[in-house]
């Protein structure tokens, strides 16, 4: 991006002229379904103050900082360990979501999250959200849909494919059996 820089990456920018950054829009999207005191943000230590500036109702202990940029898995593991220690044996619903998604139908999104919470309360499952692809895209991961889950508008995951080449992406879209991987995961601890 021409505007995004190391000192202020895209999640801290107001791309749409709304007066809200992508991070602020993400927090706003989750407020109706997750109390602010239950939200943790994992970020690089260099962005700690920027997070607290943009989300002033977060306490400093809700911003978990990694000393160096790594991939997503260590960040998720760090946050889950923290949630586990905070929950003191009681269960906790966990949603992992990036701070740079654009979601236009936020009410529909929140309904889906609430449905996922209900599902994981009754089932030992990890839920991931997929989106119907509109074109072959080599920059996204894909989820191959498996069998439908009885009584739910959900299906099991048959396979994940990370960023396929164009030929494979075209086959995925043509088959109708694949979704784009949103990177949003929901489960119960």
Predicted regions and their residues:
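Residue-level detector of conserved, well-ordered beta-strand and adjacent loop positions
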Residues: 1, 13-16, 144, 161
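Conserved beta-strand scaffold positions in the cores of enzyme catalytic domains, especially
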Residues: 12, 63, 126-128
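Conserved core of the sugar-phosphate nucleotidyltransferase
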Residues: 105-189
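Conserved N-terminal catalytic core of the sugar/cofactor nucleotidyltransferase
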Residues: 2, 6, 14-96, 104-108
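Short acidic donor-binding/metal-coordinating loop in glycosyltransferase active sites
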Residues: 99
